[in-house]
Structures are given as structure tokens and as C-alpha cells.
Amino acid sequence: MAALYACTKCHQRFPFEALSQGQQLCKECRIAHPVVKCTYCRTEYQQESKTNTICKKCAQNVQLYGTPKPCQYCNIIAAFIGNKCQRCTNSEKKYGPPYSCEQCKQQCAFDRKDDRKKVDGKLLCWLCTLSYKRVLQKTKEQRKHLSSSSRGSHQEKEQYSRLSGGSHYNSQKTLSTSSIQNEIPKKKSKFESITTNGDSFSPDLALDSPGTDHFVIIAQLKEEVATLKKMLHQKDQMILEKEKKITELKADFQYQESQTRAKMNQMEKTHKEVTEQLQAKNRELLKQAAALSKSKKSEKSGTITSP
């Protein structure tokens, strides 16, 4: 009896071939709890429910620090503290300032000073490295599948040739060699068309045309999204600066207006006081003039009556 192994989720026992690599999950658990990417940090995690779109670490950070902002280096929405995500912050402390990624052209690739850490001699960021490894794994699986299927078909041909005889085997051999020769130029043309674009990583990946095409399209779309995000960020900064200037001008205008009104009120008050003082002085002078005229009249009347 073959040995059985436990699923890491439901703990039921299955043959080793029925469990997934790495996670060691059965088919039902793989369907119920698929491995998805976190909306914020873009790391792969096992989804517990359909509504849960972020990993446990990001969920804890959201509760502690609130909704994250895009990282100023990699543009991943995972900057919970400051303007940089934790991965870029740690990499900057360890390896220094970032360089431009040779695939997505963003300023988020950190040079580890080790050629073995590079991908085909290229300095790539974290996301592009993961995408490359995914494409490489897919290519290996497809090649393995093709080699196993070709091995099985070869064994079937040998069995069929033993049963049918030598003449039929020779005809089958000529047909198979002609079909292989027809397939070779097709693969060559695919390889040439991919390598002329200059977007593939290596000649080995060029044979896997669907994966590399998807990878190139995804990389181009990421580059466009990154440039649009940068443009949007620049526009937002310009709008914020203009709004700041407008508020400063409004505040200055209000201050100048209040100062002018205060000066006008003060001048009006002083003018009123001066006017009142002059009017009072004028009344006093009029009284003095009237008193003088009366005294003069009385003196004249006294001089007339005295003889």
C-alpha cells in the first residue's frame, strides 16, 4: 500500500502526487483557499475567504496606521509609515539608494553587489524578479509536460510498430521526421520574432511564446501605469501648490483689507475729533467777539451821557 500524506489545511490523508508543491494542499483545499496576491504589498498568500483581499500583515498595519499610500520607489500601495514601503526602506538601509529596473524602468531595483542575485545579468526590481521566476517555472513545467507526452507517444509508436510490422514502422518514421522538420522552422520563426522585439529575458524563454508575450504586455502595462501615476502625482502636487498659493494670497488680501479698514476708521475718528475741537474753538471765539462788541457799545454810551 502506498504511503499517504496529510493536507496542511484539512489534515486528511492523500497520496503525495495529489498534494500541491510547497503548500501541500489537497485539491478541495486548493479550490476553497486559493493562493492570491495581496492588494497592497503584492505578496502571495492563501486566501481564507472571497472577501479577504489583503494578507494578515497588511490587515494588521491597516488597523494600526490606516490606509497605505503608494511607495515613492516601487509604486506599490504599501507605504504605511512615511512615503516608502517596508521592503524598500529595509533594502535602502542595507544596499543603498535604488537604481532603475532594466525591465519596468522604475527607480526601485536595489544592487546587492552580487552577480548571482541578478536575473540573467540584469538588475531587476522585486516584482519583475518574481514575474521572471514565475515565467521560468511555467516554461519548465511546459517542457516537462512536452517531454513526458513525447516520451509516451514514442513508446506508443514502438508498441504499434511491433504489432503492425516493419514496413508500417518505416512509413511512420518518415512521417514523424517530416513533421519534426516542419515544426523546427515554426519554432525558429517564433524565436526570431520574440528576440527581435528585445523584450524577452533569454532565448530559453522565447520558446514559451504565450508566457513571454503575457509577461512583456504586463511589464509594458505596469510601466504605463507607473508613468501615469507619476504624472498624476505631479499634477496633484501642482494643484496643491496652487491651492496653497491661493490660500496665502487670500489670507494676505484679507489682512491688507483689515489693516486698510482699521486705518480708515482711525483717520475718520481723528478727523471727527479735530473737527469737533475746531468747532468748539470757533464757538468760543464767537462768544469772545460778542462780549468785546458789547463792552465797546457800553463804553460809547457812557462817554455820550457824561457832559
UniProtKB/Swiss-Prot annotation:
In terms of domain of life, where is this protein from?
Answer: Eukaryota
Against InterPro entries, the record matches this protein to:
FAM76
UniProtKB keywords: Coiled coil
Secretion signal, residue range per the UniProt entry: none
Coiled-coil-forming residues are: 217-299
Q: Where is the composition biased (Polar residues)?
A: 161-182
Alphabetical list of Pfam families matching this protein: FAM76
* Entry GO CC: nucleoplasm
Is Coiled coil one of the keywords? yes
Q: Does Coiled coil show up as a keyword for this record?
A: yes
> Quick one: where's region Disordered?
141-195, 285-307
Question: Which family is this protein grouped under?
Answer: Belongs to the FAM76 family.
**What's this protein's name?**
Protein FAM76A
Chain's gene name: Fam76a
